[in-house]
Amino acid sequence: MNIVFMGSPDFAVPGLEKLYNEPGITIKAVVTQPDRKKGRGHKLRPTPVKQMAHKLGLKVLQTDNINREEFITNLRDLSPEAIVVVAFGQKLGKKVLELPSYGCINLHASLLPRYRGASPIHRAIINGDKVTGVTTMYMDEGWDTGDIIYKKEVKINREDTAGTLHDKLASIGGDLLVKTLNDIEKGVAPREKQSEDKASYAYKIDRKIGELDWSRSSEDIFNLVRGVNPWPGAYTTWKGKLLKIWWVEPLKLTVTENDKKMEAGEVITASQEDGIIVKTGDDAVKIIELQLAGRKKITADKFVLGYNIKEGDKLG
């Protein structure tokens, strides 16, 4: 099968590699977003997909508008039987969608119709889900609303972060893409309409979502810290300074500790032996890793040793 692959970020790279290595699939070109200025030097940086495509010796096309007529002509000249889209970053119009004979196939990082939208991985962890997965679908003109081909469930472990889950889903999703294209070509791929009644949306997140509300439950705080790690990161304030929180563990307070009149966000314990324990809306969390603005990420015992944090201090 001759295909065009469209993708941009790290999530799309395993899929590109696995399709490239599949004997029955030929990638005629890779389409990705234009190079962007990044970092302190504001240097132009290629997308991760562009970097991998060059490594594999594949033809790369870049555009800021996939639906521009001259670009559609370029795509048509490639005669793709399918267009595979993984986190490309642009919405495909009707002319592009109708171009390949087998259609446009998308890989999405959730079990559709749950978590349509831009941030399904973050939302699954933040919401405390135990299971998520990946879905392949035939694309239509909506956002993640096309007919489902295959789904693959993936367990969310308590030690998972958005980063680790991202990598798992990207790899498993790459395998599912290979199966999907092979079965489409054989004429045995299923097709199922999405249930609008079960649909939910994972809207794009920004840095503000990482601000910790200590009045929430310990489990909610635990899930938020995991769900925004490594980006955009959970944070609070301490003595007027930004404090990033990289990992916490929920704790059950004893009856005696619960009898103390403590506010949410108050430091219950700050010692090298016990680390840093903070009151939450229902119990407490133990901070494992944290980072003061402009400093390195360190463990709680080292933070206690290096900074004057003490019982009764208020976070947030």
From Swiss-Prot:
Q: Which CDD domains match?
A: FMT_core_Met-tRNA-FMT_N, Met_tRNA_FMT_C
Gene Ontology annotations for the cellular component aspect, listed alphabetically: cytosol
Give the domain of life.
Answer: Bacteria
What InterPro entries is this protein classified in? Answer: Fmt, Formyl_trans_C, Formyl_transf_N, Formyl_transf_N_sf, Formyl_transferase-like_C_sf, Met-tRNA-FMT_C, Met-tRNA-FMT_N
* One term of GO molecular function: methionyl-tRNA formyltransferase activity
Quote the catalytic activity from the record: L-methionyl-tRNA(fMet) + (6R)-10-formyltetrahydrofolate = N-formyl-L-methionyl-tRNA(fMet) + (6S)-5,6,7,8-tetrahydrofolate + H(+)
Q: Which EC class does it fall in?
A: transferase
Question: What EC number(s) would the UniProt record show?
Answer: 2.1.2.9
- Where along this sequence does the record place binding of (6S)-5,6,7,8-tetrahydrofolate? 110-113
* UniProt family annotation: Belongs to the Fmt family.
Function of the protein: Attaches a formyl group to the free amino group of methionyl-tRNA(fMet). The formyl group appears to play a dual role in the initiator identity of N-formylmethionyl-tRNA by promoting its recognition by IF2 and preventing the misappropriation of this tRNA by the elongation apparatus.
Q: What is this protein called?
A: Methionyl-tRNA formyltransferase
